[in-house]
Amino acid sequence: MQPIELSFEFFPPKTQEGVAKLRASRAELKTLSPKFVSVTFGAGGSTQQGTLDTVLEMATEGFEAAPHLSCIGSSKENLRAILSNYREHGIRHIVALRGDLPSGMGEVGELRYASELVAFIRQEHGDWFKIEVAAYPEFHPQSRSPRADLENFTRKVKAGANSAITQYFFNADSYFRFVEEAKKLGVDLPIVPGIMPITNFSQLMRFSDMCGAEVPKWIARRLESFGDNRESIRAFGVDVVTSLCRRLIDEGAPGLHFYTLNGAWASKTICERLGFKSALIAPMPSPRAARRAVFSLPL
């Protein structure tokens, strides 16, 4: 069995308090030996400098840091400058996304799709960058149909992607079905499931509505029944997501990519329940963690 790779997503903090929180969170998660960490990029490049600063700081701490890069609303000249800057700083990993057009921005930019961005990166920099792209097991909310979404995914792969990270989901069958359908179209790269820890009911429902992720009724009703009992929500959320991850690993998922929201507790608790031990706690892997992680988004 191949090692299971862990990776974690963060976003650029906007306050000094946020900076301190992120530093503490990634210090905790670093003990799980992630393969890489990714850093989001705001709509229309709104967090461009914050993304760069966060990525470079993480790189100095020994992380393989992968900045998100979205093409929507951006010119080729601007994208070329960003990529050159990352390359000059030794960054070799990119998460290539279409991104969302910010409210009030009329221009979509010179590249309209993530597949065009992937092709542009390859044209400009050859194999310098490892390129991640997004996959949608429950299909992208703006897609015409599941088939059209799958075909769009294959275009990103053929343009030169190395691997993919999915939108989060809570139905493992949707992930395995997507992987099988992608294989039928000739896709053979790793498709890593995106994992969203559950710690806040209203936040989860808001995010899921925005990105088109389905929250099963039984999960939503249980979470709703807890009301404002934060402790019960967190405990139930860890149980649900741990069970999901265990099935994904047991049935062949190549890794787990956690959407941390800049927190560490939930992601780390889930990983440890799965048998992935902190390097500071257990330098040698346990028998159960023999598949142990080199614990290493979206359209």
Predicted regions and their residues:
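Short, well-ordered coil/turn segments that N-cap beta-strands
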Residues: 2-5, 33-36, 61-65, 90-92, ...
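Active-site mouth loops of central-metabolism enzymes
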Residues: 5-21, 43, 65-77, 132-148, ...
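Conserved, mostly hydrophobic/aromatic
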Residues: 9, 37, 86, 156, ...
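Short, acidic/polar
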Residues: 16-29, 51, 76-83, 145-155, ...
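Active-site pocket-lining/capping segments in soluble small-molecule metabolic enzymes
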Residues: 17, 113-136, 185-238, 243-244, ...
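Active-site-adjacent beta->alpha loops and helix N-cap segments on the catalytic face
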Residues: 18-19, 45-57, 75-81, 101-121, ...
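Catalytic domains of carbohydrate-active enzymes, especially glycoside hydrolases
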Residues: 25-40, 158
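Catalytic beta/alpha-barrel core
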Residues: 36-47, 69-71, 95-97, 162-171, ...
